[in-house]
Amino acid sequence: MTAHKILANRLIKFFANMTKMLSYGFHALLPNKRFTLPERSGALIKGKDRPVPRIIWQTNFTNKVTLPVYLNYLFNRILSPTFAYRFMITEARADFISANYSPEIFNAYSRLQIGAAQADFWRLLVLQKYGGVYLDIDAHAVWPLGYTIKPEHEELYIIRQKNELTNYFIASKPDNANLARLIRQVMQNIEEDTIAGVYDMTGPGVFNQVLDYQNIPTTFYRITCNQGSFTNEHFQYIDKPQGKWTKEQYKVDVVRKTPPES
């Protein structure tokens, strides 16, 4: 039943790696060339309404991206034409949370000093408000999302080896009780500030702490959504001196020790 999806995953990886290698030459010739990710874009084909809205959500520190990141975006759009697209940069994330959530939640979010931790929290909040499918900026679908997410799904999470939940793909209806639980746990983690790393403070560690994979709808990542096929750390953070969050968290506290002054 899943053999065709596994084959598709391998073919996508092969194609994506070819484009990634060619992109080194492209950016060697045009080192300053960047492509713009749209703030919003409609679905290419109209699809029937479902509990999980047909919207792909992404975020990044900038909307000006290298060729591999842009190709990753285009691939998702082509593979899932019945889904609209929404994108927010760092400043837009803060504006969204300020406009749609309580001062308590906004102040907690504002204490996060690393972009990846902010993005972890934002994805929960934007899905809780509007619903849809969150994808990391380097994540791509393996199979059309309209087929992966069934009409009966109200939420869907991916698991990796050893049944570990992760958060680079999340599909959810608005007002999801499980997302509410995750949001409360992130709030508690920020308030207590006893966790050193992003992974357990705001990321997949929270999912594995709060949710039981046996009691929620899950799908295996290799037949659903993968990361890093089209792009890599070099192309993602070429314009960010701080580098990837895995390095930044050793230089900057994840949580600001005192709330920012109003």
Task: Identify the meaning behind each predicted range.
Residues 120-131:
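Small-residue hinge/turn detector
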